[in-house]
UniProtKB/Swiss-Prot annotation:
Residues 348-364 are annotated as: Interaction with VPS4A, VTA1, MITD1 STAMBP and USP8. A motif (MIT-interacting motif) lies at residues 351-361. Residues 1-168 are annotated as: Interaction with CHMP1A and CHMP1B. The keyword Ion transport does not apply. A motif (Type-2 MIT-interacting motif) lies at residues 321-332. InterPro entries: Ist1 (IPR005061), IST1-like (IPR042277). Pfam families: Ist1. This is IST1 homolog.
Length: 364
């Protein structure tokens, strides 16, 4: 089945180009659809309901095309993520069968929008044979995505979907609109009439995969009334039962003792701890012991020779300290010595007297 014209690097490059081209087209078509909705609101305000219905069919067709491009973008991304399988395996991997067949089926229908998609389909046919490509284009192989085939079909959208689009557009732009009662009466029971169906209603009701086909998110399966059952709460541990590790269940060891047990030593006893703490002497008891004679004291006393050699220290009594008496200041002048002149005895040097008086005070 290995084709002769397959080039792995060319397939890789064109897959990336297809992804970029699809993103640009999705953004462009979404913006154009938003502008077209304003035009439809103007038709409804002017009372041109039939004209508005025709324009809504164009918008639905563009929305379908955008959703189909999103599916193809996801498939191209999947092939790039698993490109190693494409290179290493000669046969087609079962996880890539839907992606490969869907890209080959969509290539002739979208090659006018995305030219690189045809190159991708040709490389896949060269890898897995032209016969496989023919089976994919006619969906005889049965692995083409059903949602993508529905989005790219040429059938007209259902009337109930057109009415829902008109109701939603009128509500967004505050335009009065009365939906067709005959069409609304044909709506299937159990489906909300004000919900816009963009192709995901059946998938959600069936609990199938989300946007992007296989590998998407799977919705939880609900009950017959559409409700989703609540999960069972986790069991909470009892507050009264303490946690403990289970004992190991292994062979006996260590002289027949099972694992996880402890045996005390038979000849070793723990020390006895007294019930009350020991008593200590108080300060009063210490002072009372000072009056006990030295004969009652147990133990060697100090040697008398050592105590005799100790110098006696005078008692420090600063309160009874008495200063020595100072001599009184003389009131009379000293007598003049013999041979001194009368003028000398009359001249008294008071500075000399003060100096000598200060010296006497210092000596005493």
């Amino acid at each position: 089945m290995l084709g002769s014209g397959f080039k792995a690097e060319r397939l890789r490059v064109n897959l990336r180009l297809v992804i970029n081209r699809l993103k640009l087209l999705e953004k462009k078509k979404t913006e154009l659809a938003q502008k077209a909705r304003k035009e439809i609101a103007d038709y409804l305000a002017a009372g041109k309901d039939e004209r508005a219905r025709i324009r809504v069919e164009h918008i639905i067709r563009e929305d379908y095309l955008v959703e189909a491009m999103e599916i193809l973008e996801l498939y191209c991304d999947l092939l790039l993520a698993r490109f190693g399988l494409i290179q290493s395996m000669k046969e087609l991997d079962s996880g890539l069968a839907e992606s490969v067949s869907t890209l080959i089926w969509a290539a002739p229908r979208l090659q006018s929008e995305v030219a690189e998609l045809k190159i991708v389909a040709d490389q896949l046919c060269a890898k897995y044979s032209k016969e496989y490509g023919k089976l994919c284009r006619t969906n005889q192989i049965g692995t083409v995505n059903d949602r993508l085939m529905h989005k790219l079909s040429v059938e007209a959208p259902p009337k109930i979907l057109v009415e829902r689009y008109l109701i939603e557009i009128a509500k967004n732009y505050n335009v009065p609109y009365e939906p067709d009662s005959v069409v609304m009466a044909e709506a299937p029971p159990g489906v909300e009439t004000d919900l816009i169906d963009v192709g995901f209603t059946d998938d959600v009701k069936k609990g199938g995969p989300g946007r992007g086909g296989s590998g998407g998110f799977t919705a939880p399966v609900g009950g017959p009334d559409g409700t989703v059952p609540m999960p069972m709460p986790m069991p909470m541990p009892s507050a009264n039962t303490p946690f403990s590790y289970p004992l190991p269940k292994g062979p006996s060891d260590f002289n027949g003792l099972p694992m996880g047990t402890y045996q005390a030593f038979p000849n070793i006893h723990p020390p006895q701890i007294p019930a009350t703490p020991p008593s200590y002497e108080s300060v009063d008891d210490i002072n009372a012991d000072k009056n006990i004679s030295s004969a009652q004291i147990v133990g060697p006393g100090p040697k008398p020779e050592a105590s005799a050699k100790l110098p006696s220290r005078p008692a420090d009594n600063y309160d009874n300290f008495v200063l020595p008496e100072l001599p009184s200041v003389p009131d009379t002048l000293p007598t003049a010595s013999a041979g001194a002149s009368t003028s000398a005895s009359e001249d008294i040097d008071f500075d000399d007297l003060s100096r000598r008086f200060e010296e006497l005070k210092k000596k005493t």
